[in-house]
Design a protein with these regions (language model features):
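Conserved "HGTGT" condensation-loop signature of ketosynthase/thiolase-family condensing enzymes
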Residues: 2-134, 138-147, 153-240, 257, ...
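A conserved active-site cap/scaffold subdomain adjacent to cofactor or substrate pockets
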Residues: 240, 244-248, 264
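Short, charged, surface-exposed loops that flank catalytic or proteolytic processing sites
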Residues: 199, 261-264
């Protein structure tokens, strides 16, 4: 009749213990959960994994470059945009008593690489990334009005889930027909907004998943949120903290606390899994204006968004559809290009040449021609 949902992240404790040479033990997982969910597909294809590894930042940086090209920003304009965008997140986090980092960072600090803000994958620096080195936890209790009444829980402590949607359609980033427009996200957003509008429900607060700036942008675009509306109430994952595998619960708990303070407020929360692979959205309100409705749009998305085949050409010419420059220990290590060959199929190319890495950070490479031979990068432009 009631459920307790609990989650947390203690990675900061682990890191401090390792730094100080102290023992750190995690509770052993000796029992399987009642229901275990495992994806049928992998998050990435082999070519992506070889070029970018398992860390998410490179994949999101590639998507960010495609978004930059779509919005016709110059590289400098884009760097300024990202700095200003997350400066506002930092300001909001500074006023959040639950934020992990309440320091206010300026746009200049965020966009400029430094020893404390190392570049990781262009255009992303450390302050563009989610911060998972935190000690944070949250919990929710879900129950019915009937049980709440029996327990004499006052109405002012109750918040209601109104509508939610999700997509679990999985395609590796390189095989997505449009890197900046996931079909599942469009379908899930359409259902959520149309269902809410039928009941005259309009969100007043947003908490858009903010593992990296492009995730916020994609949700904001899909939801058609005006530029002057804040996209977070917490301050976002780089500043409020991004407890690994638990941020959705953390954001929801804070949203419900905010809604409790004002009966007229309605909160919209979004979530992501993988490399902008799966998306979920939910609307909560103080007033139970509708019976809860939910939809999984996965099957519809699978029919509409088919993976683009990987290239079988070993040599030829293609067009860059996304790119980044990866860093290791604050030094550039390689440029990574997602490209489309002459047959419209996809390939991943890399270069460790310093002039190519510099070019990725000096001029727009998305849209340029790229030449390859024996499955290796030859030239750009």
């Amino acid at each position: 009749r009631a459920s307790l949902i609990v989650g947390g992240e203690a990675r900061f404790k682990m890191i401090q213990a390792l730094k100080e040479g102290l023992p750190y033990e995690e509770m052993a997982l000796t029992e399987n959960p009642d229901n275990y969910v495992k994806a049928k597909e992998d998050l990435y294809v082999a070519e992506e994994l070889d070029a970018l590894g398992m860390m998410a930042v490179g994949y999101y940086a590639i998507i960010e470059s495609a978004m930059r090209y779509k919005n016709q920003y110059s590289l400098k304009e884009h760097e300024n945009f990202l700095g200003n965008f997350y400066e506002r997140f930092s300001q909001i986090a500074s006023k959040n008593p639950h934020a992990w980092n309440q320091k206010i960072y300026t746009a200049e600090e965020i966009k400029t690489p430094s020893n404390k803000n190392q570049r990781i994958a262009y255009p992303y620096n450390k302050l563009h990334n989610t911060s998972w080195n935190v000690n944070q936890a949250s919990a929710l209790i879900l129950t019915s009005d009937e049980i709440a009444d029996k327990l004499k829980i006052p109405f002012n402590k109750r918040v209601y889930p109104l509508v939610s949607s999700e997509t679990n359609h999985m395609i590796g980033v390189i095989q997505r027909p449009d890197l900046t427009s996931p079909v599942g996200l469009k379908l899930a957003t359409k259902y959520l907004i149309e269902t809410a509008e039928k009941h005259n429900i309009k969100p007043t607060f947003y908490e858009l998943y903010s593992c990296f700036p492009v995730a916020v942008q994609l949700f904001s675009e899909a939801l058609n949120i005006p530029e002057n509306i804040d996209k977070t109430i917490t301050g976002g994952m780089p500043f409020a903290g991004g407890p690994l595998n638990n941020y959705m619960l953390h954001a929801t708990a804070q949203m419900l606390m905010r809604i409790r303070e004002n009966n007229s407020e309605v909160g919209l929360i979004t979530g992501v899994s993988g490399m902008m692979t799966k998306q979920a959205l939910a609307i909560w309100g103080k007033n139970p204006a509708m019976d809860f409705e939910s939809k999984d749009v996965t099957k519809e998305a699978e029919k509409l968004e088919l993976p683009v085949p990987m290239s079988k050409l070993s040599s030829g010419e293609g067009k860059v559809i996304g790119c980044t420059a990866l860093y290791e220990k604050n030094m550039p290590s390689k440029a990574v290009f997602y490209a489309e060959d002459s047959q419209g199929h996809r390939l991943v190319l890399t270069s460790t040449m310093s002039e190519i890495i510099k070019q990725v950070e000096a001029e727009e490479c998305v849209g340029l021609k790229i030449n390859f031979s024996n499955n290796r990068f030859v030239s750009l432009g």
